[in-house]
């Protein structure tokens, strides 16, 4: 009887483990000297094979943080699986506007988003490392940051969206 129960319990633990790995929080040490957290959402199919995936970068609004998107849109993991893509939600602090400050070297968020986060994601995950497979979007301040970064880094992002 114990052996009969062991198999279903083992299978259940494997399934739970795979689901738990779908949403990661990673920390990137930026050139600004900040340790910044990012949510990375992988499609369920990521665990299978060697497929490379397109990436959507979602920037949060003013007053938010890296976890804002997963909080306001908890179905993001299902959407990542439905559309077979990776979603990355970087931290832009509460008011960076995702651009480089000419006065404060600790606020170089354009470089962080368009260079550091991209390089980290492409080197740690199986991405399609090409502008044609990268999109950036955001809400409010994040929408501004998405438009700003996409226009200034056309070689990095192939699609852009802005919400509100």
What is the meaning of each model-derived region?
Residues 1-23:
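Bacterial Sec-dependent N-terminal signal peptides
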Residues 20-164:
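Non-catalytic cap/lid and distal C-terminal segments of serine-dependent acyl enzymes
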């Amino acid at each position: 009887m114990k052996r009969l129960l062991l198999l279903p319990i083992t299978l259940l633990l494997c399934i739970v483990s795979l689901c738990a790995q779908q949403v990661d929080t990673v920390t990137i040490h930026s050139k600004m000297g900040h340790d910044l957290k990012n949510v990375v959402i992988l499609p369920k199919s990521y665990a299978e094979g060697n497929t490379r995936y397109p990436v959507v970068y979602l920037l949060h609004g003013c007053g938010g943080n890296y976890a804002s998107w997963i909080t306001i849109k908890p179905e993001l993991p299902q959407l990542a699986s439905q559309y077979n893509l990776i979603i990355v939600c970087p931290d832009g602090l509460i008011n960076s506007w995702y651009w480089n400050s000419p006065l404060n070297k600790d606020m170089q968020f354009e470089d962080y988003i368009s260079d550091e986060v991209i390089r980290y994601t492409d080197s740690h995950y199986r991405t399609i490392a090409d502008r044609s497979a990268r999109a950036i979007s955001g809400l409010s301040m994040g929408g501004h940051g998405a438009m700003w970064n996409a226009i200034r880094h056309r070689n990095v992002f192939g699609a852009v969206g802005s919400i509100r």
